[in-house]
């Protein structure tokens, strides 16, 4: 059988969540508002599949450069290459 090369392959530990979080999906995460220029951390919530970035970007920090519907455009550096990701607010956390 061939090896799987799916979207979430090789992410068993990266996307694992704690056994019993206090609230599975707090509504406050979904209604977060970010301004253009804010620095945000990309923290993938594996229980929400819409607007989820690729697991390779989990833990990266980027800058909000715009909005596309309910999602945000986040500019990051992947090595030397600049990339723009479309991510919903459930997977973002404001840098303090």
UniProtKB/Swiss-Prot annotation:
Residues 1-22 are annotated as: Disordered. Pfam families: Ribosomal_L21e. InterPro entries: Ribosomal_eL21, Ribosomal_eL21_arc, Ribosomal_eL21_sf, Translation_prot_SH3-like_sf. One of its GO terms (cellular component) is ribosome. It comes from the Archaea. Keywords: Ribonucleoprotein, Ribosomal protein. NCBIfam families: PRK04306.1. HAMAP family: Ribosomal_eL21. Belongs to the eukaryotic ribosomal protein eL21 family. This is Large ribosomal subunit protein eL21.
